[in-house]
A protein has these predicted regions:
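Alpha-helix C-terminal capping segments
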Residues: 14-15, 25, 47-55, 71-77, ...
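Hydrophobic "anchor" residues on beta-strands that sit immediately upstream
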Residues: 30, 59, 79, 156-157, ...
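Active-site HxH/HxHxD metal-binding segment of metal-dependent hydrolases
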Residues: 37-131
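Metallo-beta-lactamase
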Residues: 37-39, 137-142, 146-216, 222
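Short alpha-helical segments that sit at the start of domains
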Residues: 211-238, 291
Length: 298
C-alpha cells in the first residue's frame, strides 16, 4: 500500500495529515478536497497526484480556514469550488480572518499567511451538488464555519471539521466552532449517518468505522455540552472577562492554557454566551481594564 495515500472507498483516497487531503477520481472529473498546509503538502500532493495518474482536477474546499487552503498555491487546479457562505472568505483574506478570528492579531500568533483567490477561478456550490456520476454529494455541515460542507459517498461520509478526533480535542480543550448550537445540530445529522452504517472521514482524526464515528460524534457533543455547563456555572457565580472564562474552562478540561487555545476557544465560548441570552440576562462591569460578564436568571 502506498505511504502517500490510503484508499477508503472506490475512487476516494486520503493523503494523511491534519487536516487530511482527499483525492477523488470520478468518471467525468477529478477532485482535490482541502489541499491543507503548504509546509507539508507541496511535494506530497504532487507525488500523490502523479502516482494516481491525476493530471486535471478541480479543488473543493470544505471551508476556508487557512489550514485547509494554504497549499492551494502548490496546485494547478482547473477551478476552485466552495459553498456560498464561504465564498467571500475565499476571495479576501481580510474577510476570512475577521469572520474566523474576529480580528487580525491572531494571524501572527498562529503563523497564518494571507491568501487571496481571484474570483474568476471560483465556482459556488451548495448542498446536493454532485461531484460526478455516483461520486459523492455535498452535505451541509455548518457550525464549525458558516458554510462547512461534507461529502456523502456510497459507504462513507466526509465530515470535515464538524467532528474532531480525541487527540485534537485533548490538545485544544475547546473545539473551535463559529456557531456552537449549529455545530450540535450538525453532529446529530452526522450521528444519523453513523447509525445507517456509514464510515467517517475526519479532517483532524483517523478514518472511523460507523461505530467509531458514532463514538466521536458523542465525544464532540458531550464536550460542547460540558463547555456550556461550565460557562453557566462560572458566569452565574462571578463576573469574568471572556479570556478569563476561557482560561478557567481550559484548566478544568486539562488542556494547555496558551494564546492560541484561549483566542480560538473564545470564539466558541462567545457563541455559547450569545445563545444563553435566550434564557439568561447578561450584565457587564469594567474593572482592571477588562470588560467582565455575568449571567443572571430571568
Amino acid at each position: 500500500m502506498s505511504t502517500l495515500y490510503r484508499a477508503v472507498e472506490r475512487g476516494v483516497y486520503i493523503v494523511p495529515g491534519s487536516p487530511i487531503t482527499m483525492i477523488i477520481k470520478c468518471s467525468d472529473a477529478n477532485w482535490v478536497v482541502d489541499p491543507g498546509l503548504l509546509t507539508n503538502r507541496r511535494d506530497l500532493l504532487r507525488s500523490a497526484l502523479e502516482r494516481l495518474s491525476v493530471e486535471k482536477y478541480n479543488v473543493l474546499l470544505s471551508h476556508t480556514h487557512y489550514d485547509h487552503l494554504e497549499a492551494l498555491e502548490a496546485l494547478t487546479s482547473s477551478r476552485i469550488y466552495v459553498t456560498v457562505l464561504e465564498y467571500t472568505s475565499l476571495l479576501s483574506s481580510l474577510v476570512r480572518n475577521i469572520v474566523t478570528y474576529g480580528f487580525t492579531q491572531l494571524l501572527r500568533i498562529l503563523g497564518v499567511r494571507s491568501i487571496d483567490v481571484k474570483k474568476e477561478m471560483v465556482e459556488i456550490v451548495d448542498e446536493g451538488f454532485k461531484l460526478g456520476d455516483s461520486c459523492g454529494e455535498l452535505l451541509n455541515l455548518s457550525g464549525h464555519s458558516p458554510g462547512l460542507t461534507g461529502i456523502v459517498f456510497e459507504d462513507a461520509v466526509f465530515v470535515g471539521d464538524a467532528v474532531f478526533g480525541e487527540k485534537l480535542l485533548s490538545r485544544v480543550g475547546i473545539p473551535y466552532h463559529f456557531n456552537a448550537r449549529q455545530a450540535l445540530s450538525t453532529l446529530e445529522k452526522i450521528k444519523a449517518y453513523a447509525e445507517k452504517g456509514y464510515s467517517g472521514i475526519l479532517s483532524h482524526g483517523p478514518f472511523a468505522n460507523s461505530d467509531k464515528l458514532a463514538e466521536y460524534v458523542d465525544l464532540n457533543a458531550e464536550r460542547l455540552k460540558l463547555i456550556r455547563e461550565l460557562v453557566i456555572d462560572h458566569l452565574t457565580q462571578e463576573p469574568l472577562s471572556l479570556e478569563e472564562l476561557v482560561g478557567k474552562i481550559l484548566g478544568e478540561l486539562r488542556a494547555e492554557i496558551n494564546a492560541g487555545n484561549i483566542l480560538l476557544g473564545s470564539v466558541t465560548v462567545n457563541s455559547i454566551i450569545s445563545d444563553l441570552l435566550e434564557e439568561y440576562g447578561l450584565s457587564t462591569e469594567v474593572s482592571g481594564g477588562l470588560v467582565r460578564y455575568r449571567l443572571t436568571r430571568k
